[in-house]
Amino acid sequence: MAKKVQAIVKLQIPAGKATPAPPVGTALGPHGVNIMQFTKEFNAKTQDQMGMIIPVVMTVYQDRSFTFITKTPPAPVLIKKELGLNSASGEPNKTKVGQLTKEQVKKIAEIKMPDLNAANLESAMSMIKGTARSMGVTVEE
């Protein structure tokens, strides 16, 4: 018989740096999950992606066991990493903070492809371009 799902928890945690302190502890504590076990498993699974923010979808079962799936980093994080930016533009229409080439957009789209609901690489690239423009990054056509 399948386990009964108690909750689905979504978090964004820096890769390899999950600790029982907030926000992880406060999100998982009410569900009775073994927080130390989760942090060890998450840190081991994301060790190779240090410095990136990794979204996690965690399924908590009624017997307090859990499973989790890591997703690809958010597009803005990948764009900022690619351009070496600390933050996006506060006024994207007025202040531009960088420029992405078509190759850089393609590279980011290929990384994000498993998590995007895009039918092909072209539509994934279009989504990445839109995200970049909303951050104040110009995109080479």
Curated annotation (Swiss-Prot):
It comes from the Bacteria. SUPFAM superfamilies: Ribosomal L11/L12e N-terminal domain, Ribosomal protein L11, C-terminal domain. Transmembrane segments: none annotated. The keyword Oxidoreductase does not apply. Pfam families: Ribosomal_L11, Ribosomal_L11_N. GO terms for biological process: translation. One of its GO terms (cellular component) is cytosolic large ribosomal subunit. One of its GO terms (molecular function) is large ribosomal subunit rRNA binding. Keywords: Methylation, Ribonucleoprotein, Ribosomal protein, RNA-binding, rRNA-binding. One or more lysine residues are methylated. Part of the ribosomal stalk of the 50S ribosomal subunit. Interacts with L10 and the large rRNA to form the base of the stalk. L10 forms an elongated spine to which L12 dimers bind in a sequential fashion forming a multimeric L10(L12)X complex. PANTHER family: 60S RIBOSOMAL PROTEIN L12, LARGE RIBOSOMAL SUBUNIT PROTEIN UL11M. Belongs to the universal ribosomal protein uL11 family. Forms part of the ribosomal stalk which helps the ribosome interact with GTP-bound translation factors. This is Large ribosomal subunit protein uL11. The lineage of its organism: Bacteria, Bacillati, Bacillota, Tissierellia, Tissierellales. The gene is rplK.
